[in-house]
């Protein structure tokens, strides 16, 4: 069966200094509960990895970004939201398939920041 990553909400508006929570639900448990990453993408730029193994912060990424969850339910939280956080965020699940690893992206969440 096709693996589906469902992200909610599809769009969210936040005030500067506020908090944003993005959810990612997988139709199949993520391999080893750790192969879940979060990416940030801005227009005209390649995706930037923020979180890997569900909760590990990538090098150089602000600690305002926090990842949590396991199995089929994962969350990305952004605290003390800044204008520079305006972007689209994606979860990426890695699944162990008999034919090899399979990667599936969520549909994305647009974060709009209001001053």
Curated annotation (Swiss-Prot):
Residues 92-104 are annotated as: Complementarity-determining-3. SMART domains: IG, IGv. It holds the Pfam family V-set. The keyword Hydrolase does not apply. The keyword Cell membrane does not apply. GO terms for cellular component: immunoglobulin complex. Gene3D superfamilies: Immunoglobulins. Keywords: Adaptive immunity, Immunity, Immunoglobulin. Residues 1-24 are annotated as: Framework-1. Residues 25-37 are annotated as: Complementarity-determining-1. Residues 60-91 are annotated as: Framework-3. It comes from the Eukaryota. Residues 38-52 are annotated as: Framework-2. GO terms for biological process: adaptive immune response. Residues 105-114 are annotated as: Framework-4. Residues 53-59 are annotated as: Complementarity-determining-2. This chain was obtained from antibody to type VIII pneumococci and was isolated from the serum of a single rabbit. This is Ig kappa chain V region 3315. It comes from Oryctolagus cuniculus (Rabbit).
